[in-house]
């Protein structure tokens, strides 16, 4: 079960994890993606924001930028054993710089996400802000 105040919702999908992410701005889509990933991998339990890491990601367009951003989050989790909890994102065109806050993975029992996918990925501006759909391979 997830609180109503979250800016993302998990949608039904046959084999993977499908997430609808909302934000007032495109920056918020990326920031809320971090929260959605954190929520899933730690079963909705909070993750401390004890450390910060700076990441930079590029894409050829907005969907590829989001894909590469998620891929970088998964790299932090798998290779650096760093669990993201929130982010502060700066966008300039198809370039992203973010400070990712989180904690050491050893402090948590995590559910694995294998990879980001381009399947069903969509990012669009709506009347009420921005919305993205992402599917993660688990």
Where in the sequence are the language-model features?
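N-terminal intrinsically disordered, cationic/polar leader segments
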Residues: 2-138
């Amino acid at each position: 079960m997830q609180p109503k105040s979250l800016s993302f919702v998990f949608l039904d999908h046959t084999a993977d994890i499908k997430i609808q992410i909302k934000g007032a701005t495109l920056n918020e889509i990326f920031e809320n993606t971090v929260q959605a990933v954190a929520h899933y991998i730690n079963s909705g339990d909070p993750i401390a924001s004890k450390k910060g890491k700076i990441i930079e990601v590029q894409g050829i367009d907005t969907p590829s930028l989001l894909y590469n951003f998620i891929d970088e989050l998964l790299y932090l989790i798998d290779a650096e054993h760093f669990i993201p909890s929130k982010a502060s994102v700066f966008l300039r065109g198809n370039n992203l710089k973010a400070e990712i806050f989180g904690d050491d993975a050893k402090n948590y029992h995590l559910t694995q996400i294998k990879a980001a996918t381009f399947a069903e990925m969509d990012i669009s501006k709506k009347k009420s802000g921005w919305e993205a759909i992402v599917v993660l391979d688990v």
